[in-house]
A protein has these predicted regions:
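Hydrophobic core segments of alpha-helical transmembrane domains in multi-pass membrane transport
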Residues: 23-29, 45-50, 77-84, 106-110, ...
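Structural signature of hydrophobic alpha-helical transmembrane segments
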Residues: 35-51, 71, 95-106
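Transmembrane alpha-helix boundary signature
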Residues: 82-97
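Cytoplasmic-side transmembrane-helix entry/capping segments in multi-pass membrane proteins
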Residues: 63-76, 97-103, 130
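N-terminal membrane topogenic signal
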Residues: 8-18
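C-terminal transmembrane helix-loop-helix hairpin of multi-pass membrane proteins
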Residues: 6, 128-205
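Short amphipathic alpha-helical coupling elements at transmembrane boundaries
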Residues: 10, 57-61, 126-134
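C-terminal ends of transmembrane helices
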Residues: 52-65, 112-122, 196
Length: 205
């Protein structure tokens, strides 16, 4: 039970795939202009990572070592296709906004990395929890970045106006820089800086 708890919690805080391992940062720059897109992308990665790790763990004793990467890619691609089809069926506008980024989950370092590093050497349930934990850690960073980008860049959250019109009438203007990709990188850098300031053991000696 302790190992299961560690598999879920470690990727969220101490071993976050984006802020600690610096993996999967491309999508954190691309899909964090709006909070809605970031939430959907985070949920998609969480589902794909969890289910892919589960399936690969179930098959771990039957996969020949020389073709394991091909099998892993096939499993991940299947999960991504399923998620993409569900989005197109039930959230078409979001699917259209995210466009190719959902498909690029197939090449996400986090998904392949957890299968290779954890799922192939551990039991199915633990692998599922590890995949979900890494997906949650990934989604958390995306949501934080998207929150500030949408709020300060557009004055909205989930598309709804949250900054009162009176504030704009007083002279406030949305920060156009926040919706540009470089600002996502700067915000991500700030998150990494804050985390390493809090967790001293993450600082390089």
């Amino acid at each position: 039970m302790a190992n299961i708890k560690e598999a879920i919690l470690t990727p969220i805080f101490k071993g976050n795939p984006i802020s600690v391992l610096v993996l999967g940062i491309c999508s954190s720059l691309a899909v964090t202009v709006q909070l809605k897109g970031a939430c959907v992308m985070g949920l998609s990665v969480m589902i794909v990572t969890g289910l892919s790790s589960l399936v690969c763990s179930l098959l771990r004793n039957t996969i020949p070592n020389r073709i394991r990467i091909i099998v892993q890619l096939t499993v991940v691609a299947l999960m991504v296709i399923l998620v993409d089809q569900v989005l197109k069926a039930y959230a078409y506008s979001v699917s259209k906004t995210l466009s190719v980024y959902i498909g690029l989950i197939i090449t996400n370092c986090i998904v392949m990395g957890r299968i290779e590093a954890y799922a192939l050497g551990n039991k199915p349930f633990a692998s599922l929890m590890d995949g979900l934990g890494n997906g949650i850690g990934y989604a958390l960073i995306l949501i934080i970045v998207a929150f500030f980008r949408e709020l300060l860049g557009s004055g909205t959250l989930f598309g709804y106006q949250v900054i009162p019109q009176a504030v704009f009438d007083a002279g406030y203007m949305n920060n156009g820089l926040m919706i540009l990709p470089p600002m996502a990188l700067i915000l991500l850098g700030c998150i990494i800086w804050v985390q390493r300031a809090i967790q001293k053991d993450l600082q390089e000696k």
